Amino acid sequence: MLLQAFLFLLAGFAAKISASMTNETSDRPLVHFTPNKGWMNDPNGLWYDEKDAKWHLYFQYNPNDTVWGTPLFWGHATSDDLTNWEDQPIAIAPKRNDSGAFSGSMVVDYNNTSGFFNDTIDPRQRCVAIWTYNTPESEEQYISYSLDGGYTFTEYQKNPVLAANSTQFRDPKVFWYEPSQKWIMTAAKSQDYKIEIYSSDDLKSWKLESAFANEGFLGYQYECPGLIEVPTEQDPSKSYWVMFISINPGAPAGGSFNQYFVGSFNGTHFEAFDNQSRVVDFGKDYYALQTFFNTDPTYGSALGIAWASNWEYSAFVPTNPWRSSMSLVRKFSLNTEYQANPETELINLKAEPILNISNAGPWSRFATNTTLTKANSYNVDLSNSTGTLEFELVYAVNTTQTISKSVFADLSLWFKGLEDPEEYLRMGFEVSASSFFLDRGNSKVKFVKENPYFTNRMSVNNQPFKSENDLSYYKVYGLLDQNILELYFNDGDVVSTNTYFMTTGNALGSVNMTTGVDNLFYIDKFQVREVK
């Protein structure tokens, strides 16, 4: 009887634990693109239709399941404002069920160098896709052209246009290099750790010019390269070239990530200024960054978007009937005066989120010109929140304060669920480490609790953007969108993107600001705005 009673008690305890966790969350992001259904990964073929003022996003897509698998297609979405996206029919399909239309890029062939177009097609809509055809036997570079502005495509009859007798040769990114009047392609010899650079007159015949190889973090393989001219923040008329390389697996924090190199390009060779591998985004969920072929100049010349997930756990993310979202589109510039530490300035990629919201609520300012103490924490009511909101926090550390290294001297923000405040995000800054931290593990979603690769806690080093009157100032902008968080520190000098998951319907209901020490933190500004 004792054994029977014990087993009954144990079963009841297990049932209680199971009931306290949920398997899925159906809260879809509002301002981050997600497919209606199915699986999505890398962004592809980004371009701007100048005739119709329309932005095009293509992406790796499996409409038949919520995990990666073949056949793999190019999904398609369009936008008028880079924030609100409309799903379109599949754009490019593979020829076999065991194959895939893998990642690639789009160009606008204004001058009809390919010969695919006649005068009935507006030069601004002469788009050609350059993509990898993947089969179990090989990876080869194909091209397809569109006669209707990027909605349907015809495959070039003489494909492939580039082959290397390899199963690891992919992700062509093509742009027009004006000085030489040639098309330039970067493509990854993934497991040779090479980014090969090719040139072409017509998009059909390609000449190998050089290779950028064995640089930075190697990981298991290189993927999704890109080469783009990026203007400097200090003087937009001046620019440098940036080489982007994705790594998967083998990222320093686990799984996948993006790195970049700053240098020069002469039409055939890219040369990095130094041997530093720089990190594009310090979060766990930002991969396969691709930049737009062309842009609306009012937004800037260097725009990009990334897949907001990580290959370590992307197949297990608890959303349904879709998996994965894209990051916000970001405007990139180069800060040539980035203060890496008090003695060194570096060239650093700066990111600014592009967010066009017509129905956002007003900014509500909750703290201004205030010294934070343990007794005067701030509580912000978000009971009408949809689960998507922005916040801005400008704070300073009193450098005259002496704090023991054994004290966790933090400023913390607690974003709590409305229906269940035991689910929350905690983020903030700790003085001794000079780092901003995030804890995304306080959830009752089973995936968050049980998946060992979904790192609950992470941090990123922060340096002050200014110091005056014994105060060192820091700035952070954050966007929380149902299950994805983007953080921009000091106007985008450092960025961190991470997903998080709470029980379905448990929208953010409050924000609390606390500290563990008195009179250390000065709050210059803290404000919140709901996105509806």
Swiss-Prot record:
Residue numbers binding substrate: 39-42, 60, 102-103, 170-171, 223, 311
SMART domains: Glyco_32 (SM00640)
CDD domains according to UniProt: GH32_Inu-like
One GO-annotated biological process of the protein: sucrose catabolic process
Post-translational note: Isoform Secreted is glycosylated. Isoform Intracellular is not glycosylated.
Encoding gene per record: SUC2
Enzyme Commission code: 3.2.1.26
Glycan-linked positions: 23, 64, 97, 111, 118, 165, 266, 275, 356, 369, 384, 398, 512
Entry annotated with the keyword Aminoacyl-tRNA synthetase: no
Pfam families: Glyco_hydro_32C, Glyco_hydro_32N
Record protein name field: Invertase 2
Species of provenance: Saccharomyces cerevisiae (strain ATCC 204508 / S288c)
